[in-house]
């Protein structure tokens, strides 16, 4: 029963920290030190993957209408807007199959694919090596602090300045690729925060906060699914009934908490900037250093 409660707690922490730009890795490392799951190291790696999948599913559900490129309910505001915007494309395709394809979403996925190139070429092949080199307290703490400072500096520099890119349509392939390079930093250095790195990168490139967050969430789907599937293949599916329940509890909890956090964040950034997360990261980074020096 205690392990089930721990799984519940881990799921909540994953759901909260995966989408807020504060590093899920840093939080899970600390949590596992104070509330350690009584499982093998191999199973814990599997557990991290499964609760991450729960978090990803939340994005798929929340952004379904923005990411599914085929068909749409008639009469919706989104459909009417797309129909007006892409009327010339529909005239060319007539009433055939192409008339059910949302070209703006196809283009979005092409941009996501371009942004994934750095992770595919460098991040995934060398993932184990990066974990071996950098999955340590000092690296996590430094990454937390550096990107915390980056958030504060970027927001201060952009204060009062209008964003250059205010919609997904305005996001170019070049900008998408550059955001992908920032994502690669998170793949190399744990504690950076994948969402934190991509959002900082997007803000530097002139993307609005809302578009930066939305693109970050959509970009997470292939990247995190790919990384999770690689680990699942590596570790296999050999676990007991009790372990299966632990996995299920963690996954469901991560899914539900992710739904809540994503909705909160999208509402929050409409009126506020990201500086509060920068200050939080700096404080957490200092705490990680103190823990490593005196308690680890």
Model-identified regions with their sequence ranges:
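Multi-pass membrane proteins that catalyze or facilitate reactions on polyprenyl-/lipid-phosphate substrates
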Residues: 1-296
């Amino acid at each position: 029963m205690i392990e089930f409660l721990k799984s519940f707690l881990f799921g909540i922490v994953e759901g909260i920290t995966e989408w807020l730009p504060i590093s899920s890795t840093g939080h899970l490392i600390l949590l596992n030190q104070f509330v350690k799951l009584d499982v093998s190291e191999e199973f814990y790696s599997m557990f991290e993957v499964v609760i991450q999948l729960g978090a990803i599913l939340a994005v798929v559900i929340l952004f379904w209408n923005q990411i599914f490129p085929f068909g749409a309910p008639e009469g919706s505001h989104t459909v009417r807007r797309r129909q007006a915007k892409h009327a010339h494309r529909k005239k060319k395709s007539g009433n055939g199959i192409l008339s059910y394809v949302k070209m703006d979403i196809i283009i979005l996925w092409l941009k996501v694919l371009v942004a994934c190139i750095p992770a595919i070429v460098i991040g995934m092949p060398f993932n184990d090596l990066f974990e071996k080199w950098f999955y340590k307290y000092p690296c996590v703490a430094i990454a937390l602090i550096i990107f915390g400072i980056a958030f504060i500096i970027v927001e201060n520099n952009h204060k009062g300045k209008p964003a250059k890119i205010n919609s997904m349509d305005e996001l170019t392939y070049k900008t998408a690729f550059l955001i992908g390079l920032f994502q690669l930093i998170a793949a190399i250095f744990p504690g950076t925060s994948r969402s934190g790195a991509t959002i900082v990168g997007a803000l530097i490139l002139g993307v609005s906060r809302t578009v930066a967050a939305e693109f970050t969430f959509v970009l997470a789907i292939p990247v995190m699914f790919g990384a999770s599937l690689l680990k699942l293949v590596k570790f296999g599916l050999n676990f007991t009934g009790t372990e299966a329940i632990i996995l299920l509890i963690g996954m469901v909890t991560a899914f539900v908490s992710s739904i809540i956090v994503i909705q909160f964040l999208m509402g929050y950034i409409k009126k506020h900037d990201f500086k509060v997360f920068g200050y939080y990261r700096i404080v957490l980074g200092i705490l990680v250093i103190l823990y490593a020096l005196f308690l680890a």
